[in-house]
Amino acid sequence: MLLALGLTLVLYASLQAEENSFTINSIHMESLPSWEVMNGQQLTLECLVDISTTSKSRSQHRVLFYKDDAMVYNVTSREHTESYVIPQARVFHSGKYKCTVMLNNKEKTTIEYEVKVHGVSKPKVTLDKKEVTEGGVVTVNCSLQEEKPPIFFKIEKLEVGTKFVKRRIDKTSNENFVLMEFPIEAQDHVLVFRCQAGILSGFKLQESEPIRSEYVTVQESFSTPKFEIKPPGMIIEGDQLHIRCIVQVTHLVQEFTEIIIQKDKAIVATSKQSSEAVYSVMAMVEYSGHYTCKVESNRISKASSIMVNITELFPKPKLEFSSSRLDQGELLDLSCSVSGTPVANFTIQKEETVLSQYQNFSKIAEESDSGEYSCTAGIGKVVKRSGLVPIQVCEMLSKPSIFHDAKSEIIKGHAIGISCQSENGTAPITYHLMKAKSDFQTLEVTSNDPATFTDKPTRDMEYQCRADNCHSHPAVFSEILRVRVIAPVDEVVISILSSNEVQSGSEMVLRCSVKEGTSPITFQFYKEKEDRPFHQAVVNDTQAFWHNKQASKKQEGQYYCTASNRASSMRTSPRSSTLAVRVFLAPWKKGLIAVVVIGVVIATLIVAAKCYFLRKAKAKQKPVEMSRPAAPLLNSNSEKISEPSVEANSHYGYDDVSGNDAVKPINQNKDPQNMDVEYTEVEVSSLEPHQALGTRATETVYSEIRKVDPNLMENRYSRTEGSLNGT
């Protein structure tokens, strides 16, 4: 019933609000006591709203509080002021706040206000134990319950009464606490742990005050070791030296300890599962020095040190020698001595072999005597050895041999291995390769194996070896090795001795040459586009020739040549560039050809002209012969010509409508040798304008051609007969 009544009132109020007009005048926030507060203080954020309305009663509105754009509190109210209370402000409460008022479909939001909380609350420190044994572990719990993670924790381990921090651990936790383990060391006695918490606020880390834990008491697991030295007091070489290290172990230790005795850094004695370790040795001066005793468990190590001095009974012997380097056959003389000349027992040794039990030793040196020598001197139980003396006995080198590894002829620029070897003589051996009497390369070998040098000769060369070793004899020389080098052909060139333009009929000489090459050299001459050479020559020279005594047009073209020798590649031979040769005719030949051509042209023209006139004459003779019979032809003396081959025709006038003239040779077939005079009859018809129609004028013209002796000029006589109008 009450719920229904409340809903009715709310509905009524909302309906009233919809009917009334309102406006949100302003909205802002205030912070109490301030926008900046200390950690743990109460913080009150107020949202103040100013609303105007036509209603007589206050309108109901909604107020929302935001921190960093996330809503943290909201309330429905009719009041002008609403508050958001934080009882104890913490660092995580720092941020940007704003509030929003909502009334029906209208809302308004304040600007953002920044809240800062300074300081971090104190953390809490707890320990899992207050008493611990050396080598144990203490677990420290540092927590900050009031703050929100992530939290930065810093925990330190300190010795009570000092400010020295023995260990520090930093850790960022995503929880508001952290658990850290601290091992307990041998130097720890009474400990305290200190914890400090930090929280990142914006870009600044705010830290709490450091909080100290309760005290932790540390108990020893074992004591610091102690030394016992026997004999006490002065220790002399030959005495029996006892060095004893003693440790007291408590019942709380669950791990086995190890005791170690060291001289300098060398371990001389150890003991496990015991409370002591002993080092016993006959005292010698070299055993003097700094001794350390260490007691170690899994995590704990304790140590103490002592200085032991041993008095020398007699000094170390010295081995004297004539020379450390002897030639084979020289005297090897050794002597062992002790400073102060005490009575002692001596031995002279080579490595581990005793050569003499006396103070001196001599012999003729052999190469096998090379090695390290020493001597000993003994008084009572004390025996001392001298330092090692290296002695080398050198055998003289034999004459070295010299040879090369080439299996065939040596080609210019190719590598060749030249070896030097002395089969006898003490190593190491130094070989010097001499090239053209000058030092070229040096090699040292540690055996009698050959020393191999590498060279790339470019011409015939002489090599010699010089060998040397530790022997005092001067260096020995090998024989001279002469190396013959063959050079492949290089830069093939083809040329012509005269000009590239050769006159026909003159001599033509081609030359093929190389810049360099070992003879014999094979030269081959080629003409372009021909697979086989037209000339080949094998000569002991760097050039070859091809001669042609009379050049013709056939020799015109492109030429090249190749050259090869023993050093050339089997696949290809070096080739020259191409040479162009042109052959031209001699001037007199050109003139002769011109004369012949002109004569042929003239003869052709004469024959053509003669044929032309003969055709024309025949063409005219045919109509004349058809018009009238032939008449005998009279000579100049009115004599009849009687040769049967001569045909004389006399022409009379006839009607020629077309008016064409006709010409016919008279004695065409007569033998030219028997005929001195030839006649040609020409008829000319003309029509005079004053004559009547049907009257025709005819004129006959005879041309006489007389043939005379060829050496004389040809005489021509002409005779003309004519009759006009019957005259």
Curated annotation (Swiss-Prot):
Glycosylation sites: 74, 141, 309, 345, 360, 424, 540
Name of the protein described by the UniProt record: Platelet endothelial cell adhesion molecule
Residue positions of covalent lipid attachment, annotated as S-palmitoyl cysteine: 611
Ranges annotated as spanning the membrane: 591-609
Its membrane topology: Single-pass type I membrane protein
Self-association and partners: Trans-homodimer (via Ig-like C2-type 1 and Ig-like C2-type 2 domains); trans-homodimerization is required for cell-cell interaction. Forms a complex with BDKRB2 and GNAQ. Interacts with BDKRB2 and GNAQ. Interacts with PTPN11; Tyr-702 is critical for PTPN11 recruitment. Interacts with FER. Interacts with CD177; the interaction is Ca(2+)-dependent; the interaction is direct.
Residue ranges, annotated region (Disordered): 642-672
Domain Ig-like C2-type as annotated: residue spans: 40-126, 135-213, 225-309, 315-391, 413-472, 488-578
Note on domains (UniProt): The Ig-like C2-type domains 2 and 3 contribute to formation of the complex with BDKRB2 and in regulation of its activity.
Short motif (ITIM motif 1): ranges: 677-682
Residues with Phosphotyrosine modification: 679, 702
One cellular component term from this protein's GO annotations in UniProt: cell-cell contact zone
Origin organism lineage: Eukaryota, Metazoa, Chordata, Craniata, Vertebrata
One term of GO molecular function: protein homodimerization activity
